[in-house]
Amino acid sequence: MVREGEERIGNRVSLGVIGVSYRETTLQQREQVLHILQQAQGSFRLEVFQEEKDYVLLATCHRVELYSVAPAELFDSLAQEIELLGVSPYFYRNQDCFAHLFCVAGGLDSLVLGETEIQGQVKRAYLQAAREQKLSFALHFLFQKALKEGKVFRAKGGAPYAEITIPILVDQELRRRQIDKKASLLFIGYSEINRSVAYHLQRQGFSCITFCSRQQLPTLSMRQVVREELCFQDPYRVVFLGSSELQYALPHSLWESIWDIPDRIVFDFAVPRALPSHTVFPHRYVDMDQISDWLREHRKEVNSAHLHSLREVAYRYWNSLNQRLERRDCVGANA
């Protein structure tokens, strides 16, 4: 749904994005920024603005961002709150906001350069926001065009091939720890990252893979267990946590037994982390901070020509948006 009576983007109101990524922050800092931005969603109805502002919250393993059409004061307020954490957030407005999201969707701003998962993450964040709010035309336009051009960019071979990915790194870590391919692996949560790791390991010969989800998954080719039947006393050698809501979705008594199996390894892909840091055994626990460090060691440099090409496309769409808004203003004035 598109919100009616949208205020024209100009000096007072910007189409902007504020956020942090793997470049500026640790995992713990991104968790703290996510908390601030989640709280900000509830405070967008401010008396000074006298209307509810729209937003899209994009939270992934390596970035936390809030996109909105809002006054500069709102972005400034969020930036000041984030800076109290000792973090310097980035803020892009108008055409630079377009260029940023186009590069994100195209995989050029990812820690895993050229990754495809970010396209789906951007789409899901946009669709969730569209279901819950009456988004402005500008936000609809921004996300729809960024998703479209991200696909086109990949189809034309603009996005580099990601040689080192999270599934590959997980596979390497299991080999380093000499995990037998007949070992029992448990994936809790049917998230995209859990699925990509599970299918990669299956292709590498791991044959005892179990998924645990809120409900039965009829098309899954792997073993399944529903949450009500989950027991950490079962001999799962490796456990993969794919969703931050698991910390509260599963009973505390169940979590207490996650370390009971000797030498069990836990991969926590969630942001915020599914397991609080004070409850883990460091030598048996891998979170996204450690994975990010591994990925940095293998990260390729962005091709400047690819970056320039995608930004130019974004700028053209920004100009197109302004032309459309001008036509809407003219139609409204003549009505």
From Swiss-Prot:
Statement: the UniProt record of this protein carries the keyword Lyase: no
Record-annotated site: Important for activity: H100
GO molecular function: glutamyl-tRNA reductase activity; NADP binding
Residue numbers binding substrate: T60, C61, H62, R63, S110, E115, T116, E117, Q121
Keyword NADP tagged: yes
Annotated NADP(+) binding sites: G189, Y190, S191, E192, I193, N194
Gene Ontology biological-process entries: protoporphyrinogen IX biosynthetic process
EC numbers, comma separated: 1.2.1.70
EC class of the enzyme, as a word: oxidoreductase
Family indicated by similarity: Belongs to the glutamyl-tRNA reductase family.
Record text about domains: Possesses an unusual extended V-shaped dimeric structure with each monomer consisting of three distinct domains arranged along a curved 'spinal' alpha-helix. The N-terminal catalytic domain specifically recognizes the glutamate moiety of the substrate. The second domain is the NADPH-binding domain, and the third C-terminal domain is responsible for dimerization.
Extra information: During catalysis, the active site Cys acts as a nucleophile attacking the alpha-carbonyl group of tRNA-bound glutamate with the formation of a thioester intermediate between enzyme and glutamate, and the concomitant release of tRNA(Glu). The thioester intermediate is finally reduced by direct hydride transfer from NADPH, to form the product GSA.
Complex and partners: Homodimer.
Function of the protein: Catalyzes the NADPH-dependent reduction of glutamyl-tRNA(Glu) to glutamate 1-semialdehyde (GSA).
Protein name: Glutamyl-tRNA reductase
Protein species of origin: Chlamydia trachomatis serovar A (strain ATCC VR-571B / DSM 19440 / HAR-13)
